[in-house]
Amino acid sequence: MKSYEELLSDIEEDMELMGSSHIVYSMEEDGVVTDYDYLPSDSCTISITLKELQEKLQLQMLYTKVSAHTAGADKNAPKLAVVFPGIGYTADKPLLYYTSRLAGKHGYQIQTVSYGNLPENVKGDSEKMKQAFDLALEQTERSLSSIDWNSYGSILFISKSIGTVISSAYASRHDLTVKSILFTPLAETFSLPLAGSIAFHGTADPWAETDSIQKLAAQKEVPLFLTQNANHSLETGDVLTDIFILKTTMERVQRFI
């Protein structure tokens, strides 16, 4: 099987010859691109443009890199997953609930951070947002103060919205090597070290502008999975569509875990 670099090199050459609009058929194994051709080889092939295939491969290359971030962890030591909710998006809501279940299935102990009472109506108010962040980080320090991080082989942070800022700040402050799942991160999240992180963003998220999040994620080399027309909860309002989005998201989460 060709490496990502070899496939990307092939695609760049083909784009020079044929242009980015040329339709190709990509072959996948477990959701990972392994090769491409110009004619369908079977009913399972997927028709996309060369440019789209290039972007897909670049995303997968980053994904493979961050997935290996904790490869040196002691496989025999206990594993811990910590959930950092949003202000209104609690740990019992779909993204955090099902990710926690998947982590538990993979042998992680689960701990959820509680922030206590935080300021309301923080959207668009930088002063209130800063106050909420400071209070939440202070509560996080208290909530996790008894944990001996050195006793765990693998640490997974699962976070949502403002929780993505809290989890990243906490990991940086304590110099922790973690894998991190960032659901609907804020722009402020990307001001922090994010090695070993993947992110999910909805293009209709009123809390974070898509172009900005894409640029910030690219700068930090964070694999960013976009969900079209989805809001800050990665939902569109259509029940069946939202169930499909949740399923697709959890499949990506499971591969990462």
List each language-model region with its residue ranges:
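Conserved alpha/beta-hydrolase "acid-adjacent" motif
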Residues: 206-212
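Serine-hydrolase catalytic machinery in alpha/beta-hydrolase-like enzymes
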Residues: 59-151
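Short beta-strand/loop motif that positions the catalytic acidic residue
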Residues: 199-201, 205
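Gly/Ala-rich beta-loop-alpha elbow adjacent to hydrolase catalytic centers
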Residues: 158-167
